[in-house]
Amino acid sequence: MPEGPEIRRAADNLEAAIKGKPLTDVWFAFAQLKPYESQLTGQLVTRIETRGKALLTHFSNGLTLYSHNQLYGVWRVIDTGEIPQTTRILRVRLQTADKTILLYSASDIEMLTAEQLTTHPFLQRVGPDVLDARLTPEEVKARLLSPRFRNRQFSGLLLDQAFLAGLGNYLRVEILWQVGLTGQHKAKDLNEAQLNALSHALLDIPRLSYTTRGQSDENKHHGALFRFKVFHRDGEACERCGGIIEKTTLSSRPFYWCPHCQK
C-alpha cells in the first residue's frame, strides 16, 4: 500500500491538473453520490488535502470528497476526451476543459459537509500527519511519551495511523534503521538522546521521501524515490557498519534491519 509521501505526491499531481478550474462534468459510480454530480458541475476544486492515506478533495461550494485508496484504489490524470485503456473499474470522474482526474477501484468514497468532516470516524481516529509542516519534533516527542503510546512497541506503533498518519512499513523500517533501534523498543525505555533522534527521524524520513526524487533503482517501492538503506535489502551489507541486513516479520509485516548496529 502506498504510504504518506506517495499519497501526497499523487495529490500534488491531481491539484496541478484541475485545481482552480471549473468542473465541466462530474460522474460518480455509486448511487448515493449521484445527486452531487449536478451540484459540483461548474464548481472549482480549491485544494486536495491528505490525511495520512486518505484524500480530501475540497470544492468551492463547501463540499469535500473523501476517498481512501486502501489496497487497490488509484487516481489517474488524463487529457479531457482521452479514453484510458484499463481493466480497472471507474469510481469517480472530475473533468475540466483540458484535464480530467479519475479514481479507479476504490470503494471507500463519501461526500462530506464541513460539519461532517469534523465527525468522520477515520478522520477523528487518525493522528497528526507527518507531512504537515506545522508538526514539530517536540510535538512528536510528547506524543511518543503520552500514556496512550509510551508502552507500545515500535514494531506496531509505527504502523498505527492513530499515532502518526502517513507512516507505513517502508518508513517504519527506514526510521528505525536511521536511529539504530529495533522494533521491540518502547518510548518509555529510551534515553533523552534516543527520544530526540527518533522524534526528528519520524518527520525527517517521510519528508525526505516526499521532497526528493533520489536514485530510481531497485531500492524504490510504491513510488518512494529516495534510496532505501535497509528496506528490501536483506543479504546486503549495511552501509553504516558493514553488517548483513536481515529480514524477519514484525506485526505481521516484513521487517528489514541490521542486527549489528540496531540494538
Curated annotation (Swiss-Prot):
Co-factor remark: Binds 1 zinc ion per subunit.
EC number: 3.2.2.-, 4.2.99.18
Binding site residues for DNA: 70, 125, 169
Gene Ontology terms: biological process: base-excision repair
UniProt cross-references to SUPFAM superfamilies, sorted A to Z: Glucocorticoid receptor-like (DNA-binding domain), N-terminal domain of MutM-like DNA repair proteins, S13-like H2TH domain
Keyword annotations: DNA damage, DNA repair, DNA-binding, Glycosidase, Hydrolase, Lyase, Metal-binding, Multifunctional enzyme, Zinc, Zinc-finger
Reactions catalysed according to its record: 2'-deoxyribonucleotide-(2'-deoxyribose 5'-phosphate)-2'-deoxyribonucleotide-DNA = a 3'-end 2'-deoxyribonucleotide-(2,3-dehydro-2,3-deoxyribose 5'-phosphate)-DNA + a 5'-end 5'-phospho-2'-deoxyribonucleoside-DNA + H(+)
Family: Belongs to the FPG family.
Protein name as annotated: Endonuclease 8
Source organism per UniProt: Salmonella enteritidis PT4 (strain P125109)
Gene symbol of the encoding locus: nei
